Amino acid sequence: MVKKNFIPSVSLVRRDLPTLVTTTTSSTALSKPTSSVVSETSSKSLPSLTSSAFSTSSGATSSSSLIVASITPPSTAGNPFILNAADKPNGTVYIAVGAVIGAIFISILIWWLVSSYLSRRFTMTNSYANDSKNLYRGHHKHSSSLQSNPFDINDEKSYMQDDWDSMSQLESSQYEDAASPFNPIQDPFTDSRRSLFISPTLQVSQYEKSHSRHQSKDTNIFIDDPSLYVGTYLEEEEEEERKLNLNRPQRAASPERKEKKINSMEGYHKRNQSSLGLIPVASATSNTSSPKKAHKRQAPSMFLDDVLNGREII
């Protein structure tokens, strides 16, 4: 491709004309008449001319040519290394990146919604389970733990604690004749003792018997209604043992103190040297002491082990 440029030329000319001197010499030949030669010299000076004019030459033209190459990309037909983007929209890369970022944000939002829903559902389930376990009380309004007044909850807890305290006091009232909880092997009649005689075997046996008796009382308490059941079990045998322990033993170091467990009436007759009513009491004591005589064949250590384990009662 040839491109022609026409550039107009503008020139500024200033010049002076040179001074011209002309000398003319003429000679005339004399003819017959006499003539004089006239020599004429003339000097003529031309005026100086100054001309300043802008002249535009329309006829003078200058031409220049510039060659520009055209770039043609290769064809994508059948070329696996060139992406054919003719059928793709503009900004495909930006669309793909935006889609990935949006998917990440949507997944985070879904995870938050699911976790909050599961947490609320678990909390509601636990609160309903706890509310169903609580006992209904007339002065308390039964409502969910999520909607109830915290002051009402504290009042209900204190009321339940008072109920448990009353239950513990009811149970402890059944054990008024028991040993001290700080010392499991303790004689319950230490304060009222009038003798210096101490029998560890007798104390252990008394503790085992009282413990078994209290266990039976516990089963009876839990079987019956604790709010209506109030009572103490004072058996005749316990009263006799209590009266017997208050008495001074006849022989302080007697090896037969295991067989000194007799009826209170018999001890009364012995102290007062009375034989009234001894025959039926003796028959009763002989019947009760008959199985104990079989233990005379055992070693003392074996008998003590049986007493400690609760298999034997002194």
Swiss-Prot record:
Keyword ATP-binding carried by entry: no
Ranges that cross the membrane: 93-113
Entry keywords, A to Z: Membrane, Phosphoprotein, Transmembrane, Transmembrane helix, Vacuole
Stored InterPro entries: PRM (IPR051009)
Lineage per the UniProt record: Eukaryota, Fungi, Dikarya, Ascomycota, Saccharomycotina
Region (Disordered), start-end ranges: 32-60, 240-309
Phosphoserine: residues carrying this PTM: S148, S254, S274
Major subcellular site: membrane
Protein's UniProt name: Vacuolar membrane protein EC1118_1N9_3125g
Origin: domain of life: Eukaryota
Membrane topology value: Single-pass membrane protein
GO CC annotations, alphabetized: cellular bud neck; fungal-type vacuole; vacuolar membrane
Basic and acidic residues composition bias: residue spans: 254-269
Compartments in which it is found: Vacuole membrane
